[in-house]
Curated annotation (Swiss-Prot):
UniProt membrane topology term: Multi-pass membrane protein
Listed Pfam families: DUF1516
Family (UniProt): Belongs to the UPF0344 family.
Name assigned to this protein: UPF0344 protein BA_1155/GBAA_1155/BAS1072
The species this protein was found in: Bacillus anthracis
Keyword Transit peptide attached: no
Transmembrane segments: 6-26, 38-58, 65-85, 92-112
Record key words, sorted: Cell membrane, Membrane, Transmembrane, Transmembrane helix
GO CC terms of this entry: plasma membrane
Subcellular location: Cell membrane
Main subcellular localisation: membrane
C-alpha cells in the first residue's frame, strides 16, 4: 500500500505541474486537471488505508503525528486544486502557492521523520 500511495503522489505532482504549465501557457488543461482529480481520490483512499493500518499498531503520541501528517496531506491536495482553479480563472495565486509549499514541506518532513518513512531526521 505504501508503494501505491507514493506512486499516486508522484503522478499527482507530475500532473499538477503539467496542468499548471498548460494553464500558464493559455491552453486548455481540463483533461489533465480531471486526471489529477482522479489521482486525488487515489491518494486520499490509499493514505486513509495507511492511516488506519498504522493506528492499529501505533503507540504513545504517534497517533497525533500521523493525524497531523494526514491533515497536511489534505492541505497539499487543497492547495494544488486551488492553484489550478485560480490559474484557470486568471486570478492571483500567490497566497495559495504559499499554502501549497508550506503544507508540502510539512508532509515531506513528517514523512521522513515518522517511523514508517526513511530515517533521515
Amino acid at each position: 500500500m505504501v508503494h501505491m500511495h507514493i506512486t499516486a503522489w508522484a503522478l499527482g505532482l507530475i500532473l499538477f505541474f503539467v496542468a499548471y504549465s498548460l494553464y500558464s501557457a493559455g491552453r486548455k488543461g481540463k483533461g489533465v486537471h480531471m486526471g489529477l482529480r482522479l489521482m486525488y481520490i487515489i491518494i486520499i483512499v490509499t493514505g486513509f488505508m495507511l492511516y488506519m493500518g498504522i493506528m492499529k499498531t501505533a503507540t504513545s503520541n504517534m497517533h497525533m503525528w500521523y493525524g497531523l501528517k494526514m491533515i497536511a496531506g489534505i492541505l497539499v491536495i487543497g492547495g494544488m486544486e486551488m492553484v489550478l482553479v485560480k490559474m484557470s480563472k486568471n486570478k492571483a495565486t500567490g497566497a495559495v502557492w504559499g499554502l501549497f509549499i508550506v503544507a508540502l514541506v510539512a508532509v515531506f518532513y513528517l514523512g521522513l521523520k515518522l517511523p514508517i518513512g526513511w530515517q533521515v531526521f
